[in-house]
Each structure stands twice: as C-alpha cells, then as structure tokens.
Amino acid sequence: MSDDLPIDIHSSKLLDWLVSRRHCNKDWQKSVVAIREKIKHAILDMPESPKIVELLQGAYINYFHCCQIIEILRDTEKDTKNFLGFYSSQRMKDWQEIEGMYKKDNVYLAEAAQILQRLAQYEIPALRKQISKMDQSVTDAIRKHSEYGKQAEDGRKQFEKEISRMQLKGVHLRKELLELAADLPAFYEKITAEIRKISAARDYFQAFRDYMSLGAAPKDAAPILPIIGLIGERGLDVTTYEWKYNQKPDKVEKPNFEMLLTAAEDSDEIDFGGGDEIDFGIAAEDDAVIDFSAVVDLVADDTGAVGEAIASGQDALHLLENSEAQKAVKHELIELLAFLSMRLDDETRETTADVLIRGAEKRPDGVAAVTEKRLKTWITEVEGILKELENPQKVHLFKIRGSPQYVEQVVEELEKKRDMEHRYKRLQTLMTENQETARQSVTKSNVELKTIVESTRVLQKQIEAEISKKYNGRRVNLMGGINQALGGN
C-alpha cells in the first residue's frame, strides 16, 4: 500500500534529503571539482554537430547533458566501434569516463539538486524582478517623455511671450536690447512733451494750495512738484547733477552708450541667440563679479573745495535717464494724480452741502476756470505718462541706458527661458532612447527567462525520474519553491 504513495520532497530541502537518505555523500563537492576539470578539457574536442552546439549553448553542463552527448557520439563515432562493442574514439572514452565519475556515489544527483535549488530560489526570481523593473522603466520613460514635452512647450511659450513683450526678435538678444535702448532719447522727448502738456495741471495745483492757504502759501512751504516744474521749463536740458546739488555743472561727461552699441555690432562672434549646443552651466567668471546695482558717480566736491564742477556717470544723465531722478518724477506724477482725482471727486459730489458751499464761495480765476472736463483730461494724461514709464520693456531699457552692463543680466534671464525649451527637448529625446533600450532589455530577458524556465522544468522531471528509479518506480513530486518559481510562466 505504501509503495503506491508518492514521495513528496520540498525543493529547498532536496539536497539535504538526498544526503540524509544516504543517496549522496556530504563531501560530494570534492568529486565535482575533478569532474568539472574533465568536462573543461573534453568539450574542446567535439564533433561538428548542430545538436551538440544547441545542447551546449549557454548551458551549465550537468550529468544529463553528458548522457545526451554520449548518445550523439554513438552516431558520430560509430566508425570507431570494434566488434566487441567498445569505441576507440578518445572523445567517446572521455565522456564515458565523465559519466562514470558522475554516477559514483550519485554525485550527479547532488549536483543536479544544487543546480535546481539555485535556479528556483535565486536565478529565476531575480530575472523576473529585473524584467518587472525594466517594465517600470519603460512606463516611467513614457510618462517623463510626455511631461518633458509639455515643459518644452511651456518654455517656448514663456520665451516667445517675453520677447514679444519686450519687442525683440529673439535672435541676437544683446544687440537687439542695446538697439532698443539706443532709441530711448526719442521716447524721453515724447515723455518730456507730455509732461509739459500737464504744466497747467501743476499750476492749478499751486493755485489751489494758495487758495486754501487764504491767498498765498507760507514762505517756508515746499515747492509744488519741483521736478515736473523743472522739466516743464527746461525739458531735457537738466542734468541729475544740477537737480541734486542745485548747481549747473561746468562740464558734462555722459557714458558713451553709442560706443557700447558699436562694439556689440562689431562682435559678430558673440551670438547669444544661435548655436546648436545648449550651455546649462554657470555664466562666465568675469560676469559673476559685476555688481549691476553699483553706480559709480564722479562728481565735483560739494564740501566747498574750489574746482571745476564735473557731472559724470549717472549724474551726467538727464532727469528721465537717471533711475533715481525718474523715480522722483513718478512720485510727483502720482501725487498730482491723487490731487486731481480728489478735486474731481469734490467737483462731482452732489450733496446739498456741497452745492451750497460751491455757490457761496468765491474762487480765484486760476481755480474757478478749471472744469470737470478739464480735470478728467488731466487725469487721463497723467495716467498715460505713468503707464508709459512703468512699461516692463521700458523699465529694462531704462536700466540698460543708465547702466549698460545691466544688459548682460537681462540677456542671461532671457537665455534661461529660451534654453528651457531646448533642455526639455533633449531630455525628451533621452527618454525615447531609454524607452527603446528598456524595451529591448525586456524582450531579451523574457527570452532568457523562458529558456531558463524550460530547462529548469526538464531538470525537475529528470531528478524526479532518477529518484523514482531508486524507489522501484514510485512517483516522486518536487514541490514548494520550484513550483512557485515555474508558476509565473
């Protein structure tokens, strides 16, 4: 009855089971060393047979391979067989000797058990894990390819939006910026003309203050909008030096902006807009030490020393060119706008008290002559001047005109936006390459896995058959880890 029961052996305990049942010796590995050395030499002298090539390709040669090789040699070496049934071929003798060494003390079973355990516990799971990891790499590469495409498009739109806002072509950024800055004098003339147009609004402000001060402002009162008044009287013929020190300079030495522009035009090799290579590095060391906020002013000594009054650097610029003076101009425009808006609100308020007050009070001509329509016109004109002075493109150009080195900072910022598109496109290309590489690796590993799984199944059946022979043909089942390892295929 017990002879009909199958023998179930856990694959991870197979080698221990064979040793404990005295089928194999504990020191079986000592015999394997000599066998492997014999196989190493025998394999160098093999007949040209497709079957042998297929059998040996990428496989670890074990006892069962040796048996198959001997069967093939029986056909290829049949001419060397004598009448007693023995072979004179050295090839056959070598492999028959190897077979005998394997059978002694069942070394072949111990080695086969060890190979099966290694395949089931390590090689097959590791290969499956590697395939899973590469599958995830393909998925990640596809996702990143899509993300980088969107980021490249966003970078392109940002750059196009920026150069459109600054009215640039985007080819030779430095040259284009300097050319736009070179056109600023015409813009300053236009703003000066518009400020002169609102001189009447300033006069109205002065007249209204005098009226509210019962006829005249105190002698120590601060002048009304002095810079706007100065521009209204003399236009651009006022340097920052004169505004600061209330003294007209004897000599004016303006920064040579035209020379800088000429140098940019002559430097054809400096192309900030073209080139196939993208530089993701840090700017040149010389650029890194430039302090764009630093202003070098060479002015006459205002401590009382006798000498020629020279306006140079920033002080040589007129009031709209100099950043400090322009800021003061904008503050005065905002002050004027606030006053005009307040007066418009007063004039348009229709409460009973306001109507009675306006009917009873006697205003001077300079105040009474200003109508609601005139106030609205002035407000529109002041708002227009402020809008032009605060235009983002003009703000950059003002800084370039006042400090030409600032152009490098603007160019660097624009280049970062432009290079963003190229950078993400290159990353996109890299992800495409990664996808292809990972897919090829997955395909190759799947083929390898299929081959290993098939050879492991064969080895499992061969071991089961050999153990079965030792137990009078009882069925033998190798179970546990081996079935888990093979179950995925």
Swiss-Prot record:
One of its GO terms (biological process) is regulation of cyclin-dependent protein serine/threonine kinase activity. InterPro entries: CDK5RAP3 (IPR008491). Keywords: Ubl conjugation pathway. GO terms for cellular component: endomembrane system. Belongs to the CDK5RAP3 family. PANTHER family: CDK5 REGULATORY SUBUNIT-ASSOCIATED PROTEIN 3. Substrate adapter of E3 ligase complexes mediating ufmylation, the covalent attachment of the ubiquitin-like modifier UFM1 to substrate proteins, and which is involved in various processes, such as ribosome recycling and reticulophagy (also called ER-phagy). This is CDK5RAP3 protein homolog. It comes from Caenorhabditis elegans.
